[in-house]
């Protein structure tokens, strides 16, 4: 495995704000230039606003991280003007197979009917997604400030003042609204003394991205108790450029630093692939986390993406839900900033995306309990469901290798009204 290198790097440029005698006021400041922050910035720019986008780094990292982007997210990317290159680069798929030991129990098709504009899912490394979004943001003239690290925030209902550290020193800016899209470890969350409520699971998983020529079909394959990884689970996905994502369950007491060493990872992959030639591209270890902030709006600061909520990777609900946060928030911020709607509209972001987060956490928790049973009774239920699924289609709905990401209907939203037979406007 070669040394990590940035996928892309960007120049730090001094902002005129840094020479101003007083903090400059911006309508919206977005903290974090990942998929969520970039999506929101593009959305706002397309609506005529001029957000400032701050990121403490100056590069896109090499790790693929999120890879699975759902139909709804692709529809959002299409509206933002970035779907075309993503579809061209990504690997489209809609069929999955579930195995136990060496036997295929069943397969499923996520988009059996024809005529859809977007595929059910594409697999595309997060660094490609970010690069396409950055290209679009630059084309729109968005004020994207690299190496601008927020180190303090003075937050109230009327706006916020951010203190920002740069290679040229510290400066301040003000914003009517600040959106924290700064990831799972969110410094913004820490600065506001906010914490997650939820659960961190004991089981660990190894992610390995390997480069190889393989004849596997472009499908999602999930194994329970495979012969090459006895008593655990495994996931296989194809990515662009002959890269394959492999997730391997590890024991709760596994030494993460030891397990990520190439000398330890390679034998595990070899047991799975046999004598196939492959190169390790990227390795990481993670634990399932299903947690969120109690509320996503705090004064003038609004949280989105992993800064607001975390779920396990199985089901592809992390990055997808974050982009959908941005989609929900963008038009509401635009209406409020234009004066066309009262500030109260922003409370619906909190209620609607809290509903989505709760649904994602519920599904992720259920998937985790099925994949890694924590009690003898859970294991008995899982094994019974797997045994029945071989021959009984009704039992397959109980098999949970990660319920895949779906849009949230917002049935409980304050913006939803009952259907009526007649409508006064025609």
Predicted regions and their residues:
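Conserved mid-domain beta->alpha element of the FAD-binding
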Residues: 33-42, 46-48, 133, 180, ...
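Active-site-adjacent segment of FAD-dependent monooxygenases/related oxidoreductases
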Residues: 62-140
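Core beta-strand elements of the Rossmann-like FAD/NAD(P) dinucleotide-binding domain
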Residues: 24-26, 168-177
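A conserved short coil-to-beta-strand element within the FAD-binding core of flavoproteins
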Residues: 146-161, 284
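Glycine-rich FAD pyrophosphate-binding loop
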Residues: 45-65
């Amino acid at each position: 495995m070669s040394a990590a290198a940035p996928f892309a790097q960007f120049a730090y440029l001094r902002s005129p704000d840094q020479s101003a005698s007083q903090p400059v006021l911006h309508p919206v400041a977005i903290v974090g230039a990942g998929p969520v922050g970039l999506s929101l910035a593009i959305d706002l720019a397309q609506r005529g606003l001029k957000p400032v986008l701050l990121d403490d780094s100056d590069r896109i990292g090499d790790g693929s991280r999120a890879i699975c982007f759902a139909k709804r997210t692709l529809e959002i990317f299409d509206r933002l003007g970035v779907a075309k290159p993503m579809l061209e680069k990504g690997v489209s798929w809609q069929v999955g197979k579930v195995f136990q030991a060496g036997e295929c129990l069943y397969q499923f098709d996520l988009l059996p009917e024809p005529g859809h504009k977007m595929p059910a899912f594409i697999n595309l490394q997060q660094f490609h997604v970010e690069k396409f979004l950055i290209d679009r943001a630059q084309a729109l003239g968005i004020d994207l400030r690299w190496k601008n690290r927020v180190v303090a925030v003075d937050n109230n209902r009327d706006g916020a003042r951010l203190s920002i550290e740069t290679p040229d020193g510290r400066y301040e800016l003000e914003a009517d609204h600040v959106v924290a899209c700064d990831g799972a470890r969110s410094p913004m969350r820490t600065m506001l003394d906010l914490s997650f409520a939820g659960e961190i699971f004991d089981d660990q998983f190894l992610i390995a991205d390997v480069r190889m020529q393989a004849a596997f079909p472009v499908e999602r394959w999930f194994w329970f108790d495979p012969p090459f990884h006895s008593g655990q689970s495994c996931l296989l996905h194809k990515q662009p450029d002959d890269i394959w994502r492999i997730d391997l369950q590890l024991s709760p007491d596994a030494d993460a630093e030891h397990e990520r060493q190439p000398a330890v990872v390679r034998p595990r992959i070899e047991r799975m692939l046999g004598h196939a030639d492959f190169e390790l591209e990227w390795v990481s270890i993670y634990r399932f986390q299903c947690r969120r902030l109690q509320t996503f709006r705090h004064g003038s600061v609004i949280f989105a993406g992993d800064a607001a909520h975390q779920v396990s990777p199985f089901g592809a609900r992390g990055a997808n839900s974050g982009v959908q946060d941005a989609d929900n928030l963008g038009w509401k911020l635009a209406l409020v900033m234009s004066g066309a709607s009262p500030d109260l509209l922003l409370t619906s972001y909190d209620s609607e995306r809290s509903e989505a987060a709760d649904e994602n956490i519920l599904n992720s928790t259920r998937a985790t309990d099925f994949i890694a049973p924590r009690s003898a009774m859970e294991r008995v239920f899982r094994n019974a469901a797997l045994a029945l699924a071989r021959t009984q289609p009704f039992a397959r709905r109980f098999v949970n290798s990660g319920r895949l990401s779906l849009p949230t209907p917002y049935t409980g939203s304050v913006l939803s009204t009952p259907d009526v037979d007649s409508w006064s406007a025609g």
